[in-house]
Amino acid sequence: VSKDREKTYVAGFSMGGYGAWYLGLSRPDIYSKAASMSGALDIAGLYQSSTIQENENNPFSWEDSFGDPEKLAGSNYDLFALYDKDVADGCVPKLYQAVGFDDFLYKSNLHVRDELQKKHADLVYKEDKGGHDWTFWDKYIQDILDWLLQ
């Protein structure tokens, strides 16, 4: 395992995609690249949408993970806020984002892509047929591995 930032990366899918970007954006001094597949990247926006809140079968606890969900926007858990801090500090990881057209997080991922493109982020964005499933992730992990080693 390298201690060289340029050879240290993180990747994940679904909530792990959020976790990968969270690690990368929280510690850009350690991680040079962070990749997400089907990531729950805009947690403040997802909380505000009825998609996740109203699902009675959802085992996810916003409060246990992030504290008061009403205070997510702009917090240390908000990837947009972390990105802006990294830009101000002059150290930002390269980002990779992949999502399937049929993924329930597709629209949220489009929003994240659009916001980061406005900020001129070093972002590779991929979308393709597929959903929030292993078939999609298995395809894109190959692409991510190639990207990480560039």
What are these regions (language model features)?
Residues 1-150:
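Non-catalytic cap/lid and distal C-terminal segments of serine-dependent acyl enzymes
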